[in-house]
């Protein structure tokens, strides 16, 4: 499973690079958290770079467009996400998950899936914060104050949501795997589906 900025929406001038890297990694299925199918068609019509690889996946039914907003605590977000995760169950990887920047919506979804597969707080945080280093040069070594502020404001809210901890509640002893399961089962995903999803994401 990979995450990136959009490989098709080039508003930040990253799409050609994201698409090239995803293709080189052998990505076979894309979970597009940001766009509608109509928006994807519009990107094809206005593309100023080679969209052949992305369009071949799309035409084969290997791109799921979820059109999520950034409110991962909202019911609509969770319902739409589950629809996309069911598509992952039905398709072989490697998988690419992206929104526009690959930061907010993608950061939450990847942390949720990492938690589901048994990742620790530190593992989820370290993966999430790579984005802030890539975009803004914010990392623990060179800019610890800003790094800690982003973790406190952004990532810890994600961690609380996944763990089912109230806003500003303590994360001590949080069970992220159990919380991730509950986040998904609360909107109708079955235990069988969750286990199949984990199998897809962790198989070699």
Could you describe each region identified by the protein language model?
Residues 1-96, 108-204:
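Cys-dependent protein tyrosine phosphatase-like superfamily
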Residues 101, 105-106:
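Ser/Thr-glycine-rich phosphate-binding loops at phosphate-binding pockets of nucleotides
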């Amino acid at each position: 499973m990979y995450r990136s900025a959009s490989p098709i929406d080039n508003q930040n001038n990253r799409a050609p690079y994201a698409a090239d890297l995803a293709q080189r990694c052998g990505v076979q299925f894309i979970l597009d958290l940001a766009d509608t199918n109509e928006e994807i068609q519009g990107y094809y019509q206005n593309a100023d770079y080679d969209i052949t690889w992305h369009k071949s996946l799309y035409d084969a039914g290997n791109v799921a467009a979820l059109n999520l907003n950034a409110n991962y605590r909202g019911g609509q977000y969770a319902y739409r996400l589950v629809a996309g995760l069911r598509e992952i169950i039905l398709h072989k990887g490697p998988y690419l998950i992206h929104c526009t920047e690959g930061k907010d919506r993608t950061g939450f979804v990847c942390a949720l899936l990492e938690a589901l597969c048994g990742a620790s707080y530190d593992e989820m945080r370290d993966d999430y914060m790579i984005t802030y280093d890539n975009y803004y040069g914010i990392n623990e070594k060179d800019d610890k104050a800003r790094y800690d502020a982003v973790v406190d404001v952004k990532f810890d809210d994600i961690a609380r949501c996944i763990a089912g901890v109230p806003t500003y509640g303590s994360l001590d002893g949080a069970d992220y795997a159990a919380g991730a399961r509950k986040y998904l089962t609360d909107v109708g995903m079955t235990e069988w589906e969750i286990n199949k999803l984990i199998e897809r994401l962790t198989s070699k």
